[in-house]
Amino acid sequence: MIGKLKGVIDSYGEDYVILDVQGVGYLVHCATRTLQALPSSGEAAVLSIETYVREDQIKLFGFRSDIEREWFRLLQTVQGVGAKVALAVLSTLPPSDLANAIALRDKAAVARTPGVGPKVAERIVTELKDKAPAFANVDPAVVHLAGAVDDDRAPRPVKDAISALVNLGYGQPQAAAAIASVARDAGEGAETAQLIRLGLKELAK
């Protein structure tokens, strides 16, 4: 089994890179984000590798970090998610954003992945919710707030403030994290406008 490859970029395809390792060209499938981050042809590169062995073929999948590779494996434990969908998810969301989206139950963020419908997105955030904290530095208070919002238990000003930040262009995980942080300091009596103002300051840090 191949766990890592270190060589020189030979060429690129739509969803793969050919890595020249001492004269042998390895075709390695990668997420779009990974391909975009790799150097130009002729330059050195290192990839963590996941090897798939089938009766009729051997496929190599490459990642910039071991964490990204672990997410690739983890995603495929979800029903309906194979290697192609897992790569598509990692093309849409980097590991840190994916971990936050799962911890915060942000199905919409995962569903932005081409080929991932609402049902699969929901399975991903549901089935992996207990595993995300191992990869993400997510404040437990933020996770608690996300659960409260999802279950319609959060105070109205909190929900309205998060919605306002999302409407301003911030992602749901970012908005929830910012409002969760400032809501603790502002107290239970904080109004929506105050939370929005404080949330924007938090996001500007």
From Swiss-Prot:
Region named Domain II: 65-143
Region (Flexible linker) location: 144-154
Gene Ontology cellular-component annotations: cytoplasm; Holliday junction helicase complex; Holliday junction resolvase complex
Region called Domain I, residue ranges: 1-64
Chain positions covered by the region annotation Domain III: 154-205
InterPro entries: DNA_helicase_Holl-junc_RuvA_I (IPR013849), Hlx-hairpin-Hlx_DNA-bd_motif (IPR003583), NA-bd_OB-fold (IPR012340), RuvA (IPR000085), RuvA_2-like (IPR010994), RuvA_C (IPR011114), RuvA_C_sf (IPR036267)
Single Gene Ontology MF annotation: four-way junction DNA binding
Domain of life: Bacteria
Compartments (UniProt record): Cytoplasm
Main subcellular localisation: cytoplasm
UniProt entry keywords in alphabetical sequence: Cytoplasm, DNA damage, DNA recombination, DNA repair, DNA-binding
Protein's GO biological process: DNA recombination; DNA repair
Pfam hit, one: RuvA_N
Entry note about domains: Has three domains with a flexible linker between the domains II and III and assumes an 'L' shape. Domain III is highly mobile and contacts RuvB.
General function of this protein: The RuvA-RuvB-RuvC complex processes Holliday junction (HJ) DNA during genetic recombination and DNA repair, while the RuvA-RuvB complex plays an important role in the rescue of blocked DNA replication forks via replication fork reversal (RFR). RuvA specifically binds to HJ cruciform DNA, conferring on it an open structure. The RuvB hexamer acts as an ATP-dependent pump, pulling dsDNA into and through the RuvAB complex. HJ branch migration allows RuvC to scan DNA until it finds its consensus sequence, where it cleaves and resolves the cruciform DNA.
Record text on subunit structure and interactions: Homotetramer. Forms an RuvA(8)-RuvB(12)-Holliday junction (HJ) complex. HJ DNA is sandwiched between 2 RuvA tetramers; dsDNA enters through RuvA and exits via RuvB. An RuvB hexamer assembles on each DNA strand where it exits the tetramer. Each RuvB hexamer is contacted by two RuvA subunits (via domain III) on 2 adjacent RuvB subunits; this complex drives branch migration. In the full resolvosome a probable DNA-RuvA(4)-RuvB(12)-RuvC(2) complex forms which resolves the HJ.
Family stated for the protein in its record: Belongs to the RuvA family.
Protein name: Holliday junction branch migration complex subunit RuvA
Native species: Afipia carboxidovorans (strain ATCC 49405 / DSM 1227 / KCTC 32145 / OM5)
